[in-house]
Design a protein with these regions (language model features):
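Bacterial N-terminal signal peptides
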Residues: 7-14
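Mature extracytoplasmic domains of secretory-pathway proteins
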Residues: 51-118
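Post-signal peptide N-terminal segment of mature Sec-exported envelope proteins
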Residues: 26-48
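Residue-level signal for mature regions of secreted extracellular proteins and peptides
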Residues: 12, 45-46, 66
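C-terminal motif of bacterial Sec signal peptides marking the signal peptidase cleavage site
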Residues: 16-18
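Bacterial N-terminal signal peptides that target proteins for export
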Residues: 1-6
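C-terminal partner/receptor-binding element of secreted or periplasmic proteins
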Residues: 117-161
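Bacterial signal peptide processing site
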Residues: 20-22
Length: 161
């Protein structure tokens, strides 16, 4: 019975760890730990000129709860007004990436939020347990300054600020 349960846990963990973006880095944390830092590359599917890299702890053969992650997003191609017109401009933005992080219903999400006043894309990475949980997060910004999508403020707007 215990062997079947252990086999099921390992199989589920292996399946869940394979979900997600493109792995570009894998750093082992030592001989006496089963944990690694995995670095994943994610290109925004709507704003294709933005690429994010997410670093997170992966413990494939462990029942630990890997919540810590960091995100860094940069402009890696052109960003057009048409791309910005297609995105969700609400204050909560939209989820652009989701990956299961453990067998305990924890999911890592990346949400894109548009700061219209500062013409900046915000990418918020966070993990949450669907039933309850601690919320850890990381933020990266991509300003539109210097892109085709940037709209220069008018002189009257600049004087009133």
């Amino acid at each position: 019975m215990k062997l079947k349960l252990l086999t099921a846990v390992f199989a589920t963990t292996a399946l869940l760890s394979g979900c997600g973006g493109n792995e570009v880095g894998d750093v082992g944390l030592g001989w006496f730990t089963l944990k690694d830092i995995k670095i994943t590359s994610l290109q925004d599917e709507v704003v294709t000129g933005v690429t994010c890299h997410i670093a997170s702890i992966e413990a494939n053969l462990s029942l630990s709860d890997p919540s810590d992650s960091s995100i860094s997003c940069r402009q890696t191609g052109s960003i057009t007004p048409e791309m910005i017109a297609k995105i969700d401009k609400s204050s909560s933005g939209e989820v652009v990436f989701k990956q299961s992080k453990s067998i305990f219903f924890k999911t890592m999400k990346v949400r894109r939020i548009y700061d219209q006043k500062n013409q900046t894309l915000l990418y918020l990475s966070y993990t949450t347990k669907e039933t309850e949980g601690s919320f850890k997060h990381s933020l990266s910004t991509v300003p539109l300054w210097g892109t085709d999508a940037y709209v220069a403020p008018s002189k009257t707007e600049a004087l009133t600020q």
